[in-house]
Swiss-Prot record:
The gene is SWEET2A. InterPro entries: SWEET, SWEET_rpt. Keywords: Cell membrane, Membrane, Repeat, Sugar transport, Transmembrane, Transmembrane helix, Transport. The keyword Mitochondrion does not apply. Forms homooligomers and/or heterooligomers. This is Bidirectional sugar transporter SWEET2a. Residues 24-111, 147-230 form the MtN3/slv domain. GO terms for molecular function: sugar transmembrane transporter activity. Mediates both low-affinity uptake and efflux of sugar across the plasma membrane.
Amino acid sequence: MDWAAPALTSFVADSSYRHLCCYGAGIAGNVFAFVLFISPLPTFKRIVRNGSTEQFSAMPYIYSLLNCLICMWYGLPFVSYGVVLVATVNSIGAVFQLAYTAVFIAFADAKQRLKVSALLAAVFVVFGLIVFVSLALLDHPTRQMFVGYLSVASLIFMFASPLSIINLVIRTKSVEYMPFYLSLSMFLMSASFFGYGVLLNDFFIYIPNGIGTILGIIQLVLYAYFRKGSSEEAKLPLLVTHT
C-alpha cells in the first residue's frame, strides 16, 4: 500500500534518530566518567612522591572497584542486551580503581597493607559469587533483574557518598573540598547516562543516574553559592576521604 510507505519511512527515521541520540548520550557518559576516573591521579602522585599514604583512605577505591565490576557485568551480553557502553565505561573504571588500590597497597604501612589487601580479595570473592549465581542458577531474564538491582543499589550508594562533602560545604560555608570540575563531571556523566537509560527504557540505568544528576545539581548550586566565601580552590579529589 502506497500510504504505508511514508509511515514506514518516518518510523525508520525516528528510530535512527533515537538510536543516534542514545549512542551519543552513552559516548558522552563514557567521556565524563573518564574524567572522574583520572581525578585521583594528583593524590596518588603525592603518595608516590612522599612514599606514604599519609591519612588517605583506600575505601573509596575499593568500593568503586566493586561498583565498576557489578555495573560492567550488567552491561555484558551475558546479562543485558544493547547496553555495551555501560560495560566499556565500567571496565575502564575497574582498571583504574584496581591500579589505584595497588599503588595504595605498595605505599601503605604493614597494618594498612594487610587490611586493604583483605578488602581487595573480598571484592573479587563477592564479584565471583555474583557471576556464579547469575550464570549457574538464573535464566537470562532473572539474571538481568538480579544484577540490575545490585547495580542500582551500588550506584545509589556511590552517588550518595558526596552527601558528606555537601554537608561539609554547608557547615564550613566553603567549597575548598568540593572541586568544581569534579562536581561538573559527575553531573554531566550522570545526566548523560540518565538520558541513555531513558532512551533505552532501562530502569536499572536511568533511576540511579537520575539520582546522581540531582546530587550533581545540588553540588553545583552549592558551589555557586559558597564560592565567594572560599579562600582558595578545592584541594582534594571528591572520591578521596580521610580516616
